[in-house]
Amino acid sequence: MAKGKDVRVTVILECTNCVRTGLNKESRGVSRYITQKNRHNTPSRLELRKFCPYCYKHTIHGEIKK
C-alpha cells in the first residue's frame, strides 16, 4: 500500500519564454513537458533547459502548479 506523501512526484515544465512573450502571432502555443522529480533531493521548483518547438530554440522550462 502507498504511504501518504510519495517521494517521487510528477511535475509539468512550461516554457518561460512563451509565457513571458504573451503568445504573440508567431507562436502557436506554449511548450510543456511532463517529468518526475524526487521531493527529497529537489525540494525547490525544478528548472531545466529544454527545446521549445514554438520558439525554435532551447529555453528554460520551469515547474508549474497543476
From Swiss-Prot:
It comes from the Eukaryota. It holds the Pfam family Ribosomal_L33. The keyword Isomerase does not apply. Keywords: Chloroplast, Plastid, Ribonucleoprotein, Ribosomal protein. One of its GO terms (biological process) is translation. It is found in: Plastid, Chloroplast. Gene3D superfamilies: Ribosomal protein L33 (2.20.28.120). GO terms for cellular component: chloroplast; ribonucleoprotein complex; ribosome. GO terms for molecular function: structural constituent of ribosome. The keyword Plastid applies. PROSITE patterns: RIBOSOMAL_L33. Belongs to the bacterial ribosomal protein bL33 family. This is Large ribosomal subunit protein bL33c. The gene is rpl33.
